[in-house]
Amino acid sequence: MLRRVLLVALLPAVSVSVAAQGPAGWKVRADQASVTLNVMPTEKGFQLTGGPGIFFNPANAVKPIYRVRATFTQLKAPAKKTYYGLFFGGNNMDAAPEYVYFGIAQDGSFLIRHRAGEQVDEMDTSLHYAIKKPDAAGKAVNTLEVQVAPTAVSYLVNGAVVDATPTRGAIAGNSFTVTEKIGGVVGVRIDDPIDVQVDNFFFESPFQLNDRGQ
């Protein structure tokens, strides 16, 4: 069965703060209790202010193969270099969440990390020409996508594949099967305080072969 979900239709006109339940089942989960992360609906999605933390709907859980995509607009320059983007493979979301996230930052770099509770392991990071840097006003618009297929996970920015990881890899020296880890909840991740708009959040399972990045 093909599942396609576009967030725009799910968001009523409400504001959501840290630890509160998001609209239509969406939730905000901050990294620490002292953190503020606010959500405000926009015409095509929502605006996140604050962080670090994640925004997700527990019902948006998918199994490989699938893809998740959203357009991110950094509205102004953050106080320091900050990664923001998508997360996928979310499990144990109410206790010690485990997921992989894919973010971009102001210097044109991307970051892929695995998080399990308080443990964070870096999988890859690099600069890439496809990532649009902020203008003089601190604004930048980039579309991020993660494509999860049987043999690889592809990471795309503005339609270009910036990285790909095989279904078998290692995190912190421990071998694991990625396909066992990447099924789960999909959502949005912010690494540090920032003001960012997220439009057209979308996931699809499965997706067509000719749409895949790898």
Language-model features: locations:
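N-terminal secretory signal peptides that target proteins for export/translocation
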Residues: 1-2
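Bacterial N-terminal signal peptides
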Residues: 5-15
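Low-complexity, Ser/Thr/Pro/Gly-rich disordered linker/stalk regions
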Residues: 20-78, 213
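Secretory/extracellular carbohydrate-interaction modules
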Residues: 50-118
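Short, aromatic/His-centered strand-loop micro-motif at the edge of beta-sheets
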Residues: 118-143
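Carbohydrate-binding surfaces in secreted/extracellular proteins
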Residues: 137-172
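Flexible glycan-contacting loops in extracellular carbohydrate-active proteins
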Residues: 166-197
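Extracellular beta-strand elements of beta-rich domains used
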Residues: 199-203
